[in-house]
Amino acid sequence: VEKNLQVRPLCPQPQILRCSWEEESELPTLRELGFEEPARDERAVLDFQGGEKEGWKWMNEWTWERGRLEKYKETRNGLVGADYSSKLSPWLSGGCISAVQVYWEIKRYEEERVANESTYWLFFELLWREFFRFVGRRYGPRLFAKGGIKGEETYPGDPHRDKLERWRLGQTEDEFVNANMVELVLTGWMSNRGRQNVASYLIHDLGQNWLDGARFFERNLIDYDPCSNYGNWAY
C-alpha cells in the first residue's frame, strides 16, 4: 500500500484569520469552571501540554534537537523516558497537529539528515493509524461490538468484577502489569508495549471482556482516539 500511496501536500497557512468578535478574552481555568487542576506526577514520561504550538515544539525537539527519529525503530518498544517514541499521539488525537504534517516533517528529515528504517517506521505507524480509521469508516459501530468486525467472540470472557477492578487499580499478581496500570491512572499515558501487555493479561490471563479494557483506556488515556483504541484492542 505504502509504495503507491500519494500524500496530499500541506495546505498553505492562512495569513489572516478574521474573527466575528473584536474584544480579546481568556479561556477560563479549570478551577473557574468548578474542576480541580490535575496534579502532575513527577514520574510522567513527558509534561504534555495541549495546543498546536506545544505539539510542534515537541515534534521539533524530539525529531531535530534530540535526533530521535533516526533511532525510532530501535527504541520504539521502550517503557521509560521521553525519547523512546515520538509521543505525538496526544496532539494527533486532539487535532492539534495532523498526520499529514507529521508525514511531511519525516520527509524533510529524510532529505536534510538521513533516511533509514527508523524514519520509514514512523511513517508506517501513521499508516497503521489510518488503517484503523478506514476500518471504522467501513464497519461503523461493529468496531465497538463484543465480537468485533467479524462478529466472532473468540474470547467471550467470564465477567468477574473483582478481577477487572484489580486490573484497573494495578493490584494484580503481575507487577509489570501493575506498574503500567498505575502509570495510566496517574499520568494518562502508557507505552505501546505496556498497552499490549496489559490488554493481553486482561483477556488471556484474567479471562475478561476486551470491551471493559477498551472502555477503561477510553476514560483514562490522554491520546484516546476511538478508531485506534478499539481497533488495537480488537486486533
Walk through the language-model features, giving the residues of each.
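Active-site-proximal binding-pocket segments
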Residues: 84-235
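Glycine/tryptophan-enriched, flexible segments
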Residues: 1-151
